[in-house]
A protein has these predicted regions:
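Hydrophobic residue at the +6 position relative to the catalytic HRD Asp in the kinase catalytic loop
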Residues: 167-174
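Charged, low-complexity intrinsically disordered tails and linkers
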Residues: 1-49
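Activation-loop N-terminal segment of eukaryotic-like protein kinases
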Residues: 174-180
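Short, flexible active-site-adjacent loop segments at beta-strand->alpha-helix junctions, enriched
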Residues: 124-125, 178, 189
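Short, contiguous, pocket-lining structural segments
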Residues: 142, 177, 201
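Conserved ATP-binding subdomain of kinase catalytic cores across diverse folds
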Residues: 28-144, 148-165, 217-220
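C-lobe/activation-segment region of protein kinase-like
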Residues: 181-232
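Generic beta-strand structural signal
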Residues: 116-119, 170, 181
Length: 232
């Protein structure tokens, strides 16, 4: 019987990325140490960082890479490259967003079973998803500050010609900033960058925000994390 040698899972990998921000190391060097031959939801605890995760339509995990922490999101190859390119362009703008590290494609399990592509972004230190901010019942003024931060981010993105398409608290990370919060775009999957947004595109983002954020606030209230408004 003939034996046919197949490439190892590592040999099949393609890592597309470049040093970003203050990073000087080629991301591929550190990324190769991660267990790409395993589905992301089964990665061993020793490579993961126990940080609060927001709600996502994809599997997302925080992993230790070199001396830092990265967020890894499984998605399609097309969407991974689309989001990576958008985040790279936004990195050069005043609008705050997470820093892209790489796209990992060609992932397979040891038996050759294909695995999804992955987008890798640098973890935003001291940031929290909105539900973690409300991990204890907080006053409504906290909510007002979060909404102010989200509105500020949306204005900044629109000024850069960024059509978000899926405005929500879930697609943002928050950091405390001078008594309030600063919002950072964390999910640009549905976004598009244009020279200039039309009035219709801006209004579409506002309509989507009203629906999505309204649903998220109702969810917070149902979970007992948002204090009900006192009657005046």
């Amino acid at each position: 019987m003939d034996t046919v040698e197949t490439p190892s899972p590592v040999d099949r990998l393609t890592i597309t990325g470049a040093p970003s921000g203050d990073a000087t190391e080629d991301p591929a060097t550190s990324l190769l140490a991660l267990p790409w031959a395993l589905p992301l939801e089964t990665w061993p605890r020793e490579v993961l960082a126990a940080l609060p995760r927001g709600i996502s339509r994809h599997v997302v995990r925080f992993a230790r890479m070199g001396g830092g922490i990265v967020a890894v999101k499984e998605t399609t190859e097309e969407l991974a490259f689309h989001e990576y390119r958008l985040l790279r362009r936004l990195e050069r703008s005043p609008a705050p967003s997470v820093v892209p590290v790489a796209v990992v494609t060609g992932r397979t399990e040891d038996d050759g079973t294909p695995l999804p592509a992955a987008l890798v972004t640098r973890h935003l230190r001291f940031s929290l998803p909105y539900r973690a901010v409300f991990s204890e019942r907080l006053e409504r003024r906290t909510l007002v500050r979060l909404m102010d931060a989200l509105a500020t981010l949306l204005v900044e993105l629109h000024l850069e010609g960024f059509f978000w398409g899926d405005v929500s608290l879930s697609n943002v990370l928050f950091r405390r900033d001078a008594g309030g919060f600063a919002a950072h775009l964390v999910d640009a999957e549905t976004g598009e960058l244009r020279q200039r947004l039309s009035t219709g595109q801006r209004e579409h983002d506002l309509d989507v925000a009203a629906v999505n954020v309204g649903g998220e606030l109702l969810d917070l209230q149902a979970s007992g994390l948002l204090k009900p408004e006192r009657p005046s």
